[in-house]
Amino acid sequence: MDFFNVVDIDAAIHFFKQYNVRKAAIFGSYARGDDHLNSDIDMIITFTEKYDLLDIIGLKQDLESVFKRPVDLLTYESLRDDSFAANILAEAKLVYEKN
């Protein structure tokens, strides 16, 4: 299923701007195109400003209300230099970048 046909991307962009997200990408089943009806949405983000756990939780909850499915959020800063991070970055598809 195409990610952009499933979600209201304009509503998501509203929240990306509200939370000062600099870049957001999907990875996992939606990025690979092998998602199913019960798939969650895996996203990796980075912020333009300092952020805390409450920002991540708030953004996660707001995105789940838009996408109507669970969202797993990672930050680029939290990735370590290992094969897991390399796999995420290799399959990531950009969905938002602040101008």
What is each model feature region?
Residues 1-23, 31-37, 48-99:
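Catalytic core of pol beta-like nucleotidyltransferases
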